Amino acid sequence: MKKFFFLIILISFSSCSTLKTPSDSNISVENKINLYIKKFAPAAVKNMRFYRIPASITLAQGVLESGYGEGTLAKKANNHFGIKCHKGWKGKSIRHDDDEKDECFRSYKNPLKSYRDHSLFLVDRDRYKDLFELRRKDYKGWARGLKAAGYATDPKYAEKLISLIERFNLTRFDE
C-alpha cells in the first residue's frame, strides 16, 4: 500500500507544470565553465605535450574566447579561440561581427580541430616565438605575452586569462 501511495504522489508531482527539471538554463556559469574544462582538458594537455603551450593558457583562452563553448563561433564554427582566417587560410570559414563587421573566422569540423589549430597558430607565427622561451608554469608571462603579441584587442585580456587560471586552478593541468 505504501508503494502504491508513493507512486501516486510521484505521478502527480511529475505531471505538475511547475515542477522544474534540470536544464542548461538552470546550470550556473561556474558549473558550465567547470564542465567545459572537464571536457577539453585532455585536448589541452595533449597539445601542451606536443606543442609546449601550457594547458592552463589553452583552457583559459578556450573558456574566454568561446564563452565556455556557448558563443556563436563555438556553436556555429567549432572555433573556440576566435581565430580569424588570416592570409593563407585555405580551410572553411564563417563570417562574424567582431572588432569589425563581417570578419572572416576559421571554421572547424569539431572543437578538437580548433584546439589543435590554436596550438599550430601560436607555434607557426613569429610574433609568438618569445612565449616559447617562458617556463611552462609561467602562466602570467604567457597571458601577458599573448596580449602583448596582439592575440586579442581587449586591454584586460591578460588579466582575464590569469583570473580564470587562478579561479579554476587550471595550473593543475600544466604538470
Residue ranges and their predicted role:
Residues 4-13:
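Sec-dependent N-terminal signal peptides
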